């Protein structure tokens, strides 16, 4: 299981908050909520699930660096593309310059 902290998510209203939980529960790799922690079944998730997590985390301003752990050889070509809206949030400059790959 993989635990992703959603602490500090920003909501515009009660329904906005409710939609975060509903949206996450619709992602196939979702297992359960543990307070404000999103728990996934496995670190091995589909490209579609990863794209949904990227959108969800971006929408609610949840720290996106924790999504870097889902980088694989298979998704590297699109997931680590510098032109994407998530690149700077997921792969901070420190991560790239430290030689981590």
Can you say where each PLM-predicted feature lies in the sequence?
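Short, surface-exposed ligand-recognition loops at beta-strand->loop->(often short) alpha-helix junctions
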Residues: 6-15
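Short, acidic/polar
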Residues: 16-21
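Short acidic amphipathic segments
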Residues: 24-34
């Amino acid at each position: 299981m993989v635990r992703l902290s959603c602490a500090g998510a920003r909501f515009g209203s009660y329904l906005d908050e409710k939609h975060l939980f509903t949206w996450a529960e619709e992602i196939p790799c979702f297992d359960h909520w543990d307070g404000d922690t999103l728990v996934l079944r496995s670190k091995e998730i589909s490209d579609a699930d990863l794209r949904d997590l990227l959108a969800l985390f971006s929408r609610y301003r949840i720290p996106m660096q924790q999504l870097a752990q889902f980088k694989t050889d298979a998704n590297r070509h699109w997931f680590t593309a510098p032109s994407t809206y998530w690149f700077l949030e997921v792969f901070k400059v420190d991560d790239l310059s430290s030689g981590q790959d």
